């Protein structure tokens, strides 16, 4: 457990530092938005390409992807049960479904790298290659189908995926690894420099994006569905993973990815597609804080299973 806390505490500290810098106005909101854009377009793709290109995969990671995707689909479907919550509006249902299927890639990459080095980074990157498209498609359809707005042009989730640089980075990295193409030294070192900046800046930006004021507006619905997400996704991943023979490091990485809080950009997507943006902000704040408690519990399960 001490090794996990050694990896988790720096992540929490950087998220807290980002919140402090934003709250005090020491770094303007525009600067963090620019950092988000830089990370999305350049830094994270560089990290993913390098991690995947230098990885050596056997059959286990593909079983890992199957468990993660199946868990996303099942927990997304479970979100439909929110319609039985008294007084709930349709946009909130779409937002709950989105919360259930999205995950924080930056925190996953941070923990995977700190705990397991390059192999951990590669496995988390591979998980991202599968989970990001699934999360985007489910989220867009859920938000649009539950939105209360005049009929008009419907967003096209598949088109949105073609504009996502993280997807291209995953495809490039997997292609390089599949064909055993080694990156030239100069290219590898350049990507390494960009990758080193990706996680630190991403965690600072994630902290800046947490609206602590949202916790004051949060109620039973927010905390109930936050716990469903933080406990439910890793639990379903574990059951499916064990059923299909997942074990060892891939199992540990799958559980870590599933146990991260919902994605910070879920607020923007909810706002743009007619979801309940206020509830999305509540989920981000509540899950980011609760994950500091649930992630160590997940690690305890990993140790109990002897996965690492």
Name each model feature, range by range.
Residues 1-308:
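Alpha-helical transmembrane segments of multi-pass small-molecule/ion transporters
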């Amino acid at each position: 457990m001490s090794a996990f806390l050694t990896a988790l505490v720096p992540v929490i500290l950087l998220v807290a530092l980002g919140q402090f810098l934003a709250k005090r106005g020491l770094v303007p909101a525009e600067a963090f938005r620019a950092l988000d854009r830089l990370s999305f377009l350049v830094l994270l793709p560089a990290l993913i390409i390098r991690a995947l290109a230098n990885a050596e995969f056997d059959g286990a990671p593909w079983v890992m992807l199957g468990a993660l995707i199946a868990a996303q689909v099942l927990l997304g479907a479970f979100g439909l049960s929110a319609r039985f919550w008294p007084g709930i509006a349709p946009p909130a249902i779409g937002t709950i479904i989105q919360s259930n299927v999205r995950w924080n890639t930056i925190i996953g990459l941070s923990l995977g790298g700190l705990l397991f080095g390059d192999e951990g980074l590669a496995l988390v990157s591979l998980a991202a290659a599968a989970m990001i498209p699934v999360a985007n498609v489910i989220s867009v359809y859920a938000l649009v189908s539950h939105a209360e707005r005049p009929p008009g042009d419907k967003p096209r989730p598949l088109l949105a995926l073609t504009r996502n640089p993280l997807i291209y980075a995953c495809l490039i990295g997997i292609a390089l690894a599949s064909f055993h193409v080694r990156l030239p030294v100069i290219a590898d070192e350049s990507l390494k420099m960009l990758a080193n900046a990706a996680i630190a800046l991403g965690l600072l930006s994630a902290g800046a994006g947490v609206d602590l004021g949202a916790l004051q507006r949060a109620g039973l619905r927010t905390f109930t569905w936050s716990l469903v997400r933080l406990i439910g996704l890793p639990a379903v991943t574990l059951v499916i993973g064990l059923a299909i023979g997942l074990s060892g490091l891939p199992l540990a990485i799958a559980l870590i990815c599933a146990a991260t809080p919902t994605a910070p950009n879920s607020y923007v997507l909810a706002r743009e597609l007619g979801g309940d943006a206020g509830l999305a902000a509540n989920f981000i704040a509540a899950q980011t804080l609760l994950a500091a408690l649930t992630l160590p519990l997940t690690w305890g399960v990993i140790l109990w299973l002897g996965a690492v």
